[in-house]
Curated annotation (Swiss-Prot):
Gene of this entry: CLPX1
Functional summary from the UniProt entry: ATP-dependent specificity component of the mitochondrial Clp protease. It directs the protease to specific substrates. Can perform chaperone functions in the absence of ClpP.
Stored PANTHER family: ATP-DEPENDENT CLP PROTEASE ATP-BINDING SUBUNIT CLPX-LIKE, MITOCHONDRIAL-RELATED, CLP PROTEASE REGULATORY SUBUNIT CLPX1, MITOCHONDRIAL
Region (Disordered): 99-153, 197-216, 546-579
Name of the protein described by the UniProt record: CLP protease regulatory subunit CLPX1, mitochondrial
Gene3D superfamilies, A to Z: 1.10.8.60, P-loop containing nucleotide triphosphate hydrolases
Family: Belongs to the ClpX chaperone family.
Gene Ontology biological process: proteolysis
Gly residues: compositionally biased ranges: 123-140
Coiled-coil stretches: none
Domain of life: Eukaryota
Tissues in which the protein is found: Constitutively expressed in leaves, shoots, roots and flowers.
Native organism: Arabidopsis thaliana (Mouse-ear cress)
InterPro entries xrefs: AAA+_ATPase, ATP-dep_Clp_protease_ClpX, ATPase_AAA_core, Clp_ATPase_C, Clp_protease_ATP-bd_su_ClpX, P-loop_NTPase
């Protein structure tokens, strides 16, 4: 019995000695790790607070788990240290949650850092690339790319509707009503975002014990998307592009005809947001205040009711897929722009502050409007649409007047679903450009087509000259082709093709090309072999040409700012009157 007691006592003594040894080793390891860790990594987990240096029967496995936990914490601290490399100040980790991924990335919103008393969020924020504050990258630092964007960041310096409209006038000819409506809509949109962000900041700065504002003061403003309707070449895309450039926000153009419902061959609607994120240089905060222009929405109308039972994945299906995105929701966008995958990485983008502008030609919608107004027939049932097809100018004028009275019911009758139309409270109709407006498009804007081609010829030290009658004839041809301003470039390319082939070859003396002249004869011969712009060779050739034309009975004056030929001006009223 005594031997058994002595044996038990010796075993207990050995076990106690082993426990003390384990405690000693663990304490030494922990002390060494604490001494060598950065100052901001000296924090204890919840298990440390509950069981400080406690060795249980788990033995070695417990130490392994603790070591794994410490490795995870040290990895997180290394991430924060790498994030703030080069910052000569004390850093204190306020909170740290979750395990790091297999491949290290910048810490998420769960890590908050205090630098010299000020709080800094190490989250990816606007698509940060892991750079330190003040360094290059797209994080949320003071020198990040978010600061270079406009929108609500302009605050009280955001341009007024009159200033926006004035900026549009420098690039867009005509469409005065559309420019006014768009200016007001864009101004209200970004004023709403700035108001909400300022309210959140003021709410965060006030003390929690302070009295909360009344419910009447907390009014949530909703955005107003825009739907542009007008013939091709009337300036729909140019208006949206110029607006985004003027307010300095990310802008992307999407084609509705390439979109399909999720799960079918084609592009998902989420691909639009990925393109916007790419334009914003993966700055999520900037992308969430961008402008998205979806073109050709009139091509995704519902298909006619028929015996075909197949699903309309490129028509009504696309409209259904766009509904929540247009209204405002958090969309999971695939990180690499591919289709959604259950195990793929996604980027969350909130669309409630993204301004969506949709555009379409809506061909023949004036017939639907005319039928709604009960003026589709006159007398004994003679259709108005037959008279509309009789002449070009009258057709465009009647269609423009009818488009100004378009209503939501007309769009629904055209093929858009009511839910889709309801997401666009601002309806803007654009009219077809007139002959004089097309002449202005050629000469007046900052990026006028005439100025573009003159710059191109100037690169080869050649002057490009347009006569007034040539410009007017080019505008008339564009109206005849029913392509609007888009048809002007095609006409100029055809007229100037032969001269652009010749001018790169530099000549000397009398073979030197000094100027190229586009007159009425060159425009009339457009498309015929051997015709086109006149090539003037030799020094002083342009001056001699101008002197010869001025000596004729009906002088041809030069391009911008001139009144043009009197007989041409007299033809316009007679043409309109005959129609």
């Amino acid at each position: 019995m005594a031997a058994a007691l002595r044996s038990n006592t010796s075993r207990e003594t050995a076990s106690l000695t082993l426990s003390h040894f384990r405690y000693f080793i663990f304490n030494r390891i922990h002390t060494a790790r604490t001494a060598t860790s950065p100052p901001h990594c000296n924090h204890r987990s919840k298990s440390d607070e509950k069981f400080p240096y406690k060795i249980s029967s788990l033995g070695t496995s417990f130490l392994d788990n603790r070591g794994g936990g410490e490795r995870r914490n040290s990895t997180k601290c290394y991430a924060a240290q790498k994030k703030l490399s080069g910052v000569g100040s004390s850093v204190v980790i306020l909170s740290s949650q979750g395990d790091p991924p297999d491949l290290w990335q910048p810490p998420g919103d769960g890590v908050s850092v205090r630098v010299n008393g000020s709080s800094v969020n190490l989250g990816r924020g606007g698509g940060g690339g892991g750079s330190s504050p003040g360094g290059p990258g797209n994080g949320t630092g003071s020198n990040s790319k978010e600061d270079c964007w406009g929108g609500s960041n302009l605050g009280s310096d955001f341009p007024t509707p009159k200033e926006i409209c004035k900026g549009l006038n420098k690039f867009v000819i005509g469409q005065e009503r559309a420019k006014k409506v768009l200016s007001v809509a864009v101004y209200n949109h970004y004023k709403r975002i700035y108001h909400e962000s300022s309210q959140k900041r003021s709410a965060g700065e006030t003390d929690s014990t302070a009295a909360k504002p009344a419910d009447d003061d907390m009014v949530e403003l909703e955005k107003s998307n825009i739907l542009l309707m007008g013939p091709t070449g009337s300036g729909k895309t140019l208006l949206a592009k110029t607006l985004a450039r003027f307010v300095n926000v990310p802008f992307v153009i999407a084609d509705a005809t390439t979109l399909t419902q999720a799960g079918y061959v084609g592009e998902d609607v989420e691909s639009i947001l990925y393109k916007l994120l790419t334009v914003a240089d993966y700055n999520v905060a900037a992308a969430q205040q961008g402008i998205v222009y979806i073109d050709e929405v009139d091509k995704i109308t519902k298909k006619a009711e028929s015996l075909n039972i197949s699903r309309d994945v490129s028509g009504e299906g696309v409209q259904q897929a766009l509904l929540k995105m247009l209204e405002g929701t958090i969309v999971n966008v695939p990180e690499k722009g591919a289709r959604k995958h259950p195990r793929g990485d996604n980027i969350q983008i909130d669309t409630k502050d993204i301004l969506f502008i949709c555009g379409g030609a809506f061909v023949d919608i004036e017939k639907t409007i005319s039928e709604r107004r009960h003026d589709s027939s006159i007398g004994f049932g003679a259709p108005v649409r037959a008279n509309m097809r009789a002449g070009g100018v009258t057709n465009a004028a009647v269609a423009s007047n009818l488009m100004e009275t378009v209503e939501s019911s007309d769009l629904i009758a055209y093929g858009l679903i009511p839910e889709f139309v309801g997401r666009f409270p601002v309806l803007v109709s654009l009219s077809a450009l007139t002959e004089n407006q097309l002449m202005q498009v050629l000469t007046e804007p900052k990026n006028a087509l005439g100025k573009q081609y003159k710059k191109m010829y100037q690169m080869n030290s050649v002057k490009l000259h347009f006569t007034e009658s040539a410009l007017r004839l080019i505008a008339r041809k564009a109206i005849t082709k029913n392509t609007g301003a888009r048809g002007l470039r095609a006409l100029l390319e055809s007229i100037l093709m032969d001269s652009m082939y010749e001018i790169p070859d530099e000549g000397t003396g009398s073979d030197m090309i000094e100027a190229v002249v586009v007159d009425e004869e060159a425009v009339e011969g457009e498309g015929r072999r051997g015709s086109g712009a006149k090539i003037l060779r030799g020094k002083g050739a342009l001056a001699r040409y101008l002197s010869e034309t001025n000596s004729k009975d009906s002088p041809q004056t030069t391009k911008e700012g001139s009144d043009g030929e009197t007989e041409v001006e007299a033809e316009i009223p007679s043409v309109v009157a005959s129609m």
